[in-house]
Amino acid sequence: MIKTKKIPQRKCVGCNEMKDKKSLLRIVRSPEGEISLDLTGKKNGRGAYVCHDKACITKAVKEKRLERALEKSISDEVYNKLLEDFDHGQQ
């Protein structure tokens, strides 16, 4: 019998859909409390996953889903930096 390899699934905090882990962006809160975009998926800290869609990120920000997932209040400056990093990652 052939074993099939499991593909890790994660839920997008914006649209609440389960998707492959590699198809999502990871936003991480480091142990020091710094919030950043994790392009490698290997940074240390608590992570939340979002689709590669600006609408999902905007919805996660607007409804404070990202704050709940990361268990930390997030300032507008950090949100703007995340959106800026997202835009640079798309190019």
Give the location of each predicted region.
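Short, flexible, mixed-charge glycine/proline-rich loop motifs
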Residues: M1-P8, T40-N44
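N-terminal, polar/charged subdomain of small-to-medium soluble alpha/beta proteins
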Residues: I7-Q9, E17, E32-S36, Q90
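Residues immediately within or flanking Cys/His clusters that coordinate Zn2+
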Residues: Q9-C12, A48
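Cys/His-coordinated zinc-binding microdomains
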Residues: N16, H52-I57
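Short recognition patches in nucleic-acid-associated and regulatory proteins
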Residues: D20-D38
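Short functional micro-motifs and their immediate structural scaffolds
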Residues: D20-S23, C56, V61
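Short beta-strand-alpha-helix junction that forms the catalytic/metal-binding core
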Residues: L37-H52
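C-terminal structural segments of small proteins and small subunits
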Residues: T58, K62-Q91
